[in-house]
Amino acid sequence: MSVEELKDTVHKLHERIQQLEKKVGVLPSSQPDFAKQLRLVLIGAPGSGKGTQSTDLKDKFCACHLATGDMLRSQVKQGTPLGLEAKKIMDQGGLVNDEIMIGMIKQELETNQDCKKGFILDGFPRTIPQAEKLDSMLKDRKTPLENAIELKIDDELLVDRITGRLVHPASGRSYHKIFSPPKKEMTDDITGEPLVQRSDDNEAALKKRLVTYHAQTEPIVEYYKKTGIWQGIDASQKPAKVWKDILKCLGQ
C-alpha cells in the first residue's frame, strides 16, 4: 500500500469515527461537554470550610474556584476595564454593583481555561437579585447551576475555628493552628510560602460578619430550595467526612 493510499484509508476511518460519534451522541473533544461540568454554588459562613472543600473540588473535577473577593482584587490589580470601574466605586466608598460582579464572573468563565470543565462559586450570590441575575447569565450560556450546597455549622463552633485560621493568600489554602496545622509552622505545605492570619479573623469581627451572613444567606437558601438544587451538609464534622458528604450530593 502506497503512502497516498494509507492516508486515504486513515481519512476514511476518521470520517467513519465521527459519524459513529454523532449517532451515539459523543461530542468532539474540541467542544466542552456541558452535561458533565461541575456547576456549583458553595454556601457557608466564614470558617465553615468553604476554602478547604473548594480546593478539593477544584482538584478532583479540574474546575475553577471562583471566589468573588479574590476575583475583584485581581481585576483591580490588573487594571481591567471592569477592575477600573470597580476601583472607582470602592474609592468613593460605594459597593460594587451586581452588574460588575456578574460581568467578572462571566469574563472568568469565558477566558479562564480552568472553567472549561466547570466552576465552584464561593461568596456569590449573597442576595436574591444577585442569584436571579447569575441564573439568567448562566442560562444564556447554556450552563445553568446544577448544585447549591450549604455547609451548616453553629456560630459557637465557628469562633474556635476562625480565630486560629491561617491562610495561603495565593491559593486560598487554609490551615488551623490547632485542628489542621501546617507541617512547618506558618508555612504552606505545597509552596513553602508564608501563611498569614487575616486581620478580621478575630471574635469581635467574626460576630459582626455572622450577623450579616445570616441576614443575607437565609433568603438565598430558600431561593435555591425552591429551584430544587439546594442540599445541606453538617460542616461541624471532620473535613474528610464533609468531603464524602459533598461527593454524595454530587452523585459520586
From Swiss-Prot:
A Pfam short name: ADK_lid
Entry annotated with the keyword Lipid metabolism: no
PROSITE patterns, alphabetized: ADENYLATE_KINASE (PS00113)
InterPro entries named among the record's database cross-references: Adenyl_kin_sub, Adenylat/UMP-CMP_kin, Adenylat_kinase_CS, Adenylate_kinase_lid-dom, AK2, P-loop_NTPase
Region NMP, annotated ranges: 67-96
Domain of life assignment: Eukaryota
UniProt keyword annotations, A-Z: ATP-binding, Cytoplasm, Kinase, Mitochondrion, Nucleotide-binding, Transferase
Subcellular location: Cytoplasm, Cytosol; Mitochondrion intermembrane space
Enzyme class (EC, first level): transferase
Subunit composition and interactions: Monomer.
The protein's name in its UniProt record: Adenylate kinase
Organism from which the protein derives: Lodderomyces elongisporus (strain ATCC 11503 / CBS 2605 / JCM 1781 / NBRC 1676 / NRRL YB-4239)
Gene: ADK1
